[in-house]
Amino acid sequence: MSPKQVIDFFGSQVATARALGIEQPSVSAWLKTGEVPMDRQYQIELATNGQLRADLPAMRVSQ
């Protein structure tokens, strides 16, 4: 998933940060690097009920 997809889903960088319990500068850093860290991707997948999916589904951990 791309940072833009995540931010578009939640509506803003601030809303994304709040939904994930992180600070907004962390979300801004994703835009600068062009990628969402894998551990956050899994958290986002869970937070969106799978509407956004982690890039490496084979590496998912069981819940």
Annotated model-derived regions:
Residues M1-A15, A19, N49-M59:
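A short, Lys/Arg-rich alpha-helix, primarily the initiator
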Residues A17, S28, E45:
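Alpha-helical and His/Cys-centered functional microenvironments
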Residues I22-E35:
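Recognition helix of helix-turn-helix/homeodomain-like DNA-binding domains
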Residues V36-D55:
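DNA major-groove recognition helix of helix-turn-helix/homeodomain DNA-binding modules
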Residues V61-Q63:
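Charged low-complexity stretches with an acidic bias
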